Swiss-Prot record:
Domain bHLH: 46-98
Designated name of the protein: DNA-binding protein inhibitor ID-1
Gene Ontology CC terms, in alphabetical order: centrosome; cytoplasm; nucleus
Matching InterPro entries: bHLH_dom (IPR011598), DNA-bd_prot-inh (IPR026052), HLH_DNA-bd_sf (IPR036638)
Stretches of the chain forming a coiled coil according to its record: none
Subcellular location: Cytoplasm; Nucleus
Native source organism of the sequence: Rattus norvegicus (Rat)
Record's keyword annotation contains Transcription regulation: yes
Post-translational modification: Phosphorylated in vitro by PKA and PKC.
Swiss-Prot/TrEMBL keywords: Biological rhythms, Cytoplasm, Developmental protein, Nucleus, Phosphoprotein, Repressor, Transcription, Transcription regulation
GO molecular function terms noted in the UniProt entry: identical protein binding; proteasome binding; protein dimerization activity; transcription corepressor activity; transcription regulator inhibitor activity
Subunit composition and interactions: Heterodimer with other HLH proteins. Interacts with COPS5, IFI204, GATA4, NKX2-5, CLOCK and BMAL1. Isoform Short can form homodimers.
Motif Nuclear export signal: chain residues: 91-104
Length: 164
């Protein structure tokens, strides 16, 4: 990684959103000092704020993130090496595809009679579960009664099963 020398000190211009309206030592809320230092427009100050080991740790973390993205995004080609830019492009496309799919599912669900919603409402599921539980309960009660009657008749079939 090439880093500009600290002798070429350049100051951030007014287009730098992190530095605009802030004093040099002020920390931006929500970001660590290290993140702010990396994000500043004056990249020439980077070597003074981070030592080489810290830069290597950050690069290692980023490479791990790219590897994880390669695992998660199914549209990435697995048979060849892809650049970081290509990984990011596939990630953006994949997120956009997921958003479109989510929006189309919600449109189908709100359209009324045009199609069934992809997910059944919880009340419907609860009703189905209750019906199944009642069916299982009545079936198991039936077998318990059958077993009791079988024992009561001395091991033989109850009269209504004997065909008489």
């Amino acid at each position: 990684m090439k880093v500009a020398s600290s002798s070429a000190a350049a100051t951030a211009g007014p287009s730098c959103s992190l530095k605009a309206g802030r004093t040099a030592g002020e920390v931006v809320l929500g970001l660590s000092e290290q993140s702010v230092a990396i994000s500043r427009c004056a990249g020439t100050r980077l070597p003074a704020l981070l030592d080489e080991q810290q830069v290597n740790v950050l690069l290692y973390d980023m490479n791990g993130c790219y590897s994880r993205l390669k695992e998660l995004v199914p549209t990435l080609p697995q048979n060849r090496k892809v650049s970081k830019v290509e990984i990011l492009q596939h990630v953006i496309d994949y997120i956009r595809d997921l958003q479109l799919e989510l929006n189309s599912e919600s449109e189908v669900a709100t359209a009324g009679g045009r199609g069934l919603p992809v997910r059944a409402p919880l009340s419907t599921l609860n009703g189905e579960i209750s019906a199944l539980a009642a069916e299982v309960r009545s079936e198991s009660e039936y077998y318990i009664i059958l077993l009791w009657e079988t024992k009561a008749t001395g091991g033989g079939c109850p009269p209504y099963f004997s065909g008489a």
